[in-house]
Design a protein with these regions (language model features):
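C-terminal cap of metal-dependent C-N hydrolases
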Residues: 298, 355-390
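Metal-associated gating/positioning segment near the N- to mid-region
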Residues: 33-97
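N-terminal metal-binding scaffold of metallo-dependent hydrolase/deaminase domains
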Residues: 1-26
Length: 390
């Protein structure tokens, strides 16, 4: 199965490349995949390291975890510690990436330095980062300069829509649940206002923007209207915002403290409808692992994020395919073709001539999630990822 849908065929692979696709091929070593899917490995462009700490050990761990979940290519967020906003940190992060045995790891650059000045975007792009990242806390004059670089180098701008003046001390969605818990909330407008602003910048400069981890249906609506107007914008939504609501924060459950915050139940259902109607372009696990010392504390003090990377494909399959929300072919577009396109790659098809970056997925097995930092801890998932050597 690839972005074009499911079909029952044999695939011949020689020297890591697909050389033939047909019924009843013979000769050579045979892998019996009866009852399983042959899939392109997934791509996830919104991954953070343990405690957002950038070092070789954490990169290796995340690379190996990704493969367990069927994810063969990840892009690390740039707002790590240290942030990828200068040549020294970039070279430090790149050292050893070619020697990883797990998923391929790429890097994005942080367009803003800690002092809110512009990083050297041109140099960092030339040295191998796949995309510039920008939070909309950037003032308009800085955002416009970033857009000019994006226009010049013809890359996709990864944009997180948020407003510092509205976030303030907020730790979850502003709504009934936050009021009941007595926690400061973050209004949807924090995201929506800046999606609208960045759409206008994309229109003016004719640049590509991928809005990262969108949580509001209104933002999705604005982005899709912009697409109809010919503006090259797209949106990514996390699996958690499609399946879980802010009710998960009840009893001060710090695993449900995410950035962006989980939406209301009504908005979660609207996001599901947007997915069914092909209004969402990319999916992410929004994987952000934290040490227990940073999670097993008061909700206000807890780190943001949860874990899902090692369960990625079984999670997508169980919650989206078996439930009938989308098809397997559509999942391949959302988790392979479109994310790959955002970093300048062409992936998502199984056809003659392509590199055999594939996995096998057996949908008939089941397992229970055993991870206290997962929102799905204790839930049963369908499917097992099987690595194949090509």
């Amino acid at each position: 199965c690839d972005e074009d849908g499911e079909r029952k065929l044999d695939v011949r692979i020689e020297d890591g490349v697909v050389t033939e696709i047909a019924l009843d091929l013979s000769g050579g070593e045979v892998i019996d995949a009866q009852g399983a899917y042959l899939l392109p490995s997934l791509v996830d462009t919104n991954i953070r390291l343990q405690d957002s700490t950038l070092n070789a050990k954490n990169i290796k761990i995340i690379s190996d975890e990704a493969m367990l979940g069927g994810v063969g290519h990840i892009v690390l967020n740039a707002d790590s510690n240290p942030a990828i906003d200068n040549e020294i940190v970039l070279e430090f992060a790149q050292n050893g990436l070619d020697n990883l045995s797990g998923a391929k790891v790429d890097l994005m650059l942080n367009s803003l330095k800690e002092d809110a000045t512009l990083s050297n975007i041109a140099i960092l792009l030339k040295k191998g980062v796949v995309a510039p990242y920008m939070s909309t806390i950037a003032k308009n004059n800085i955002a416009i300069k970033i857009a000019e670089y994006v226009q010049m180098y013809k890359v996709t701008l990864f944009c997180k829509a948020e407003d510092n003046s509205l976030i303030k001390s907020g730790v979850m969605l502003d709504g009934n649940v936050s009021s009941k818990l007595g926690l400061a909330g973050i209004p949807n407008l924090s995201e929506v206002l800046h999606v609208s602003r960045m759409i206008e910048i994309a229109r003016h400069f004719k640049i590509k923007i991928l809005f990262k981890a969108i949580a509001s249906p209104r933002s999705v609506s604005l982005i899709n209207q912009a697409k109809k107007d010919g503006i090259d914008v797209s949106c990514e939504v996390s699996i958690h915002h499609l399946l879980k609501s802010d009710k998960e924060c009840n009893e001060f459950n710090t695993t449900a403290k995410l950035d962006p915050p989980l939406a209301s139940n009504e908005d979660m259902l609207e996001l599901q409808n947007a997915l069914k109607n092909s209004q969402i372009d990319c999916l992410t696990t929004l994987h952000q692992p934290s040490s227990p010392v940073n999670k097993e504390v008061a909700f206000y003090d807890a780190a943001y994020g949860c874990e899902a990377l090692s369960d990625a494909l079984p999670l997508y399959y169980t919650k989206l395919i078996r439930s009938g929300i989308i098809s397997m072919g559509e999942l391949m577009k959302l988790t392979v073709s479109n994310p790959a396109k955002s970093i300048g790659l062409k992936k998502g098809k199984i056809e003659v001539g392509v590199k055999a970056d594939f996995i096998l997925f057996n949908p008939k097995t089941t397992k229970f999630v055993q991870n206290t930092q997962s929102l799905y801890n204790g839930e049963e998932l369908n499917g097992e990822v099987i690595q194949i050597k090509t």
